[in-house]
Amino acid sequence: MQFSGVVLILISMTLVNFVFFETKVEAGKFGKCKPNICAKTCQTEKGKGMGYCNKTECVCSEW
């Protein structure tokens, strides 16, 4: 009974690691625009008030 519990824990840990690894890879593909860097870039370099991420590109507001 204890052996099957250990095997079950090992299998579940492997599945959890696989799911989190896949999530990181998927987020990396679409994570090109970083909101904090976008906002700073719009404020300092372009003289705009705010910046936000629209999918993968940084968009500066007009005001």
From Swiss-Prot:
Its main location: secreted. Keywords: Disulfide bond, Ion channel impairing toxin, Neurotoxin, Potassium channel impairing toxin, Secreted, Signal, Toxin, Voltage-gated potassium channel impairing toxin. Disulfide bonds join C33-C53, C38-C58, C42-C60. One of its GO terms (molecular function) is toxin activity. The keyword Signal applies. Expressed by the venom gland. Residues 1-27 form the signal peptide. GO terms for cellular component: extracellular region. It is found in: Secreted. Has the structural arrangement of an alpha-helix connected to antiparallel beta-sheets by disulfide bonds (CS-alpha/beta). Belongs to the short scorpion toxin superfamily. Potassium channel inhibitor family. Alpha-KTx 21 subfamily. Negative results: does not block voltage-gated sodium channels rNav1.4/SCN4A, hNav1.5/SCN5A, mNav1.6/SCN8A and rNav1.8/SCN10A, and Kv1.1/KCNA1, rKv1.4/KCNA4, rKv1.5/KCNA5, rKv2.1/KCNB1, hKv3.1/KCNC1, rKv4.2/KCND2, rKv4.3/KCND3 and hERG potassium channels, when tested at a concentration of 0.5 uM. Reversibly and voltage-independently blocks voltage-gated potassium channels rKv1.2/KCNA2 (73%) (IC(50)=196 nM), hKv1.3/KCNA3 (50%) (IC(50)=508 nM), Shaker IR (30%), rKv1.6/KCNA6 (22%) (at 0.5 uM). Interaction of Ts15 with Kv1.3/KCNA3 is stronger than its interaction with Kv1.2/KCNA2. This is Potassium channel toxin alpha-KTx 21.1. It comes from Tityus serrulatus (Brazilian scorpion).
